[in-house]
Structure formats: C-alpha cells, structure tokens
Amino acid sequence: SSAASDVYKRQAVGNGGIGILPWKEPFSIKQIVLNHVFDAGAPHEVSRLIRGINPFSMNVKVDGQVVDGTHISGWEQCILLKEALHQTRFVYANKLEVSYNICALRSMPYAGLVQVKVKALAPVDLSVENGAEVPDEYLQPRIQRKSIQDYGLHLKLLRTSALTRHRNLQVSATSAFIFENDTKVEESDNKRNIFTKYLKTGEDFSFALLGAVCSQRDFIDPCNESDREVIYGAKEGVDRLMDLHLEQWNELWKGDIQIVGDDEAQRAVRFALYHLYSSARSGSRLSIPPFGLTSQGYNGHIFWDTEFWMFPPMLFLNQGIARSMMDYRTDRLKPACQRAFSYGYRGAMFPWESDDVGEEPCPTFALTGPFEHHISADIAIATWNYYCMSRDIRWLREDGFPLMEQVAEFLVSRAEQNEDGSYSICNVVCADEYAEGVDDNAFTNAAARCALQDASKAAALCGIKAPVSWNAVAKGLRIPKFSDGVTREYEGYDGQIIKQADASLLAYPLKAITRPEEIKRDLLYYEPKIDKSGPAMSYSVLALQYARLGDGEKAYELFVRSFRPNQLPPFGVISEGAGGTNPYFTTGAGGLLQMVINGFCGLDLTDNGIKQLPSALPKHWKKIIVKGVGPNRRTYVREQQ
C-alpha cells in the first residue's frame, strides 16, 4: 500500500487477456494493454503491442467541481494480491468519502470492473461521466450508444471502435454503468454517458462501471462482441462477477510460496507470483512478454525470457499456464522452420523476438535478431522439461518431439566441424549481449548440447531412432575454459564486464557443470563481472547456486540484490535493472521465483520427475513452503537446520 507520493510507478491489474494500469489521480486509468494484439510501431517498422481503447475513463464532479488531485486528504492506494484488486481511498474537500476498486476480471479475459462506494460528509450533488479514451495509435474512432431493456436489464451501452493506424486492426471498447437501484443515465453534450445523484449527509451510494475491450485478433466482429461481453456481465451482476473472479484467483493461489521469518522476502515473492499469474492464463495458447501486461516494453514481444526465466516457476506451480506457454511455441513451429530455410539452415530457427505470427520482429538496429541463436535451444529444453513434469507422452509425440526434432536439425546445421573433430557455433550474440559476433559462446554451445541430448531422449520415448549426427555434435561442441578451469564465456573472452549471467548458467539450469568446486570457481569469477545496472535475474541465478552449495547467507545477499535495487515507489514494483524506470519486469520475477523454488527449497526437475536437493536457508528464515507443485499439487518444505 502507499500514501501519496511524488514518484509514482504503475501497479497494474491483469487477467491474462488485458492489463489495466490505474494511476494516482482519482479515478484515473493510464492505459489498457491488450495481450498479443499488435500493430506496426510506425510505417514499415516492426510490430508493437498496442494499447487498447480505454472504456473506463470517468470524470467525477462534486458540487460542479471536478474531483482531481487537489482538495484530497487521506489518500491511500493498495494492491490486494490475493484478490487481484487495485484499491484507492480518499476524502474529497471534506465533503465525500471515496473508495473504489479496479480489477481485470479473471473470469472474463477481455473485461474489467470498477466498483465505487461513496459516503456524503455533507449534502452534495454528485455527477459521474463515462467515456472512452482512444490512444493515438488509432484512426477514425466511432462512438455509438445503445439502450438495452430486456430480461430485467436497463443498460446504456457506450461503444467506441477504431482501426489501428498502420495495419487496420479493428478494436472495440464498450462500457456501461451498473447500479443497485434504478439510476437514470443520460447522454452528455460530448456523447458520453452521465448520471447525477443528490446525496444527503451520511448517505451511502455505490455503483460499478463494467467495460470490455475486444479486437479482431480474437473476434471477427469485435464491435458486437464487446457489447455482448458487457451485457453478459451486467446480467450476471457485480456480486457474481466478483465471486467468480475471486474463485479463479483462489485457484491460482493454490500454487504458492510461504516464507516464515522474512516478511520482505514474502512480499517480494508473492508480488512476483502475482505478476506472472496476472499476465497469463490457462487455455490461451499465449506466453508472457518481459513486462507482462503492464506496458509496451520491448514491444510486447516474446523472448528467451519466457522459456528460461518465467516458464520454470509456472511449470512447477501452474500446469495450465505452463501448457499455454508451450502451446505458444508449438503453434509457431512452421514460421520457425521457414526462418531457418531463409537463412540457409535446416530445421527450426525460432526468432529472437516473436510476435503473434511467430516471425522475427526484432528491430533491425539490433544484432540479437539475426544472431542470438541460443533461443531455439532454450525453447527445446523447455519443451523437454514440460514433458518431464507432465509425463504426457501423447503430447510429446504430437507436439513436443516435432518441435525438438526440428530444433535439433537446426543446431546440427548451425554447428561447424573443426579440424580436430570438435564442433563450434560461430558468430553469435551471447546471452551476455555485450558480446556480439563471437565464437563458441559457452552458454550457446552448452544449451545446444542439452537440446540435442534431450531430443535424442524424446525420440527414444516416441519409438524413433535419433540421427547419429545429434549425438556427434552434442559430444563435440566446444566449451571454452581458462587455464585455471574457469569456464570462459566465449573464445577470446578476457574478463570484460558482462551484461548478465551467461557462463554461470551452465551449472543451473543446464547442469553442464556439476562438481561443486567448479561451480564455485565460476561463481567467484563472474559475480564481479556483472554490470550492476544489468537485468535483475543475474543475481538470482547466482544466489540459487549458492543455496544449493550450502551457503545460505551468500545466497541471501545475492537474492536481495535481485530485487531491492530495482524496486520503485510507491508499491515496490521492480524495473529491469537497478535505477530503471519501467516496471514491472516479469523476467526478473521469474528469476526471483526460481531462486526460492529451486534454490532455497532445492526442488530440481529431472528426467524422472521432481527431486528435492540439499540446500541452505538464510539464518533468519525458519522455513519455506512451496505449495501446489506439479500435476499432483504436492507441498514441499525446507526447514532451517
């Protein structure tokens, strides 16, 4: 929660379909984010996640004066994580107590609800006006009003539709006021819906604003569909909508983490879980971008962040969301194969950034698009891990192995054989993106080796004989080393500052390095090399390894470095790097959660299922409880020794 603050960084509510970003001004909603709905950012430029038409805009007046940031006392906002509600309270001009909640309805992925309660502290005339705000990425907005009086409904619908500026995608937003008792809604001079109410001293009054935002990505006729969603929700009633919303969030929270003895860590972990849950949903066949549904950061594209950082905690705690994240990739296997073909390779070459069609939308000024090839291996590894958790052999045969097979073929065609018989992957951008155009990046090669080995195991389970080349390349891929045994990030690396963890990923999650002394050697070497303003997840993966090595205090030191320097007021949302200003960084949330689940609690996914490895807790933690793990929703506990 937060009192009034000059520095204000957003805290969104989301349901996996839309994200709603409330703001600090009374009744203000900054923007709506639509999951996986794209337009070009500019003529002939790459795709960018679009902001939705905002149907929740309200202009509230008390005795003819607009309720804005002035004459406000007792201002407080909080995010209720369990209920996924954004709550604001204040007193206006000593005349009106106000409380309102904003939520993205979990039971309706394209709808949101604003519930308002007021109490008159003096006799007041209240007027509330609702309209839609149309972002500048749209053309030709059209406003339509419709009256619904049937089956006990008395609704005044307000619909605003428009086309996106560059690709002519139609988006429609509809809203309607809902009251406990009959209240007359009229049309204002500027084609908005408005109602007025006289309140006596001590009188309570409440109303709700229901809105839906639909697009041609999901509906052939988004205009009528946004109307239908509001009509349906109004007929269900506010109480039932909220009951269903809370019921579905209660189900999500069955996958939970409890930390006994550290309230700060508990809040950070629950905040991270909340943001992943609110950015995705089971059955959507969609994935999570680096900033979830909180902004247009990184154009809303899907990166390795998904499979490497956000997918693992969802795989442990929510099978439905994990499956949707997998579906996102298997649905886009064909364009990945076409991309490999266009670059002269075999198999499937997944794009570094992915939008709805699964082609490469990375801006052309960035070399990551054509050269950061570890992404294909990362996706194949996640595919095998999904099978190891689910044990769904039918899925493996029909969806998983076909993807793994095509990635294996790409990796074999991408590798080059050296004169000594070893194999190299040359001219890549590393996970450490400060390193461009290098040969034999340790992480890229180790990930490729892991993906090839996993593909061979999957082939055997599917009754298919794996090509000999898969094993030959996997065995022969070079992993550079310094003379003292430290993993060398790439051939020619000589101690430069790195953007983020790279060689350190060989111990976890790749398990390419397993001896404790080798893991410790790499940790000690690379920790001081990490750019202190780099992405948040680097320190979490180092912390995880220290926890497994038995050093709980060092693990804790790095754990808090993965989120404390990145927290922003007033809610403590985290940015990508220390000093950043664009929250919420869901990739960092994924790293933080892996630190707790797989580090402090010691859970490890193997070919044969989940094992709990030895691990150490910080001294002030009493125990950690991870609930709802895997298909059987098991509970794991690690107590202080």
Task: Locate predicted features.
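Long, charged, mostly alpha-helical binding arms that flank functional sites
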Residues: 251, 255-260, 264-279, 427, ...
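Short coil/turn segments at secondary-structure boundaries
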Residues: 244-264, 283-291, 340-345, 485-490, ...
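Active-site core of glycosidic bond-cleaving carbohydrate-active enzymes
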Residues: 302-332, 381, 385-388, 398, ...
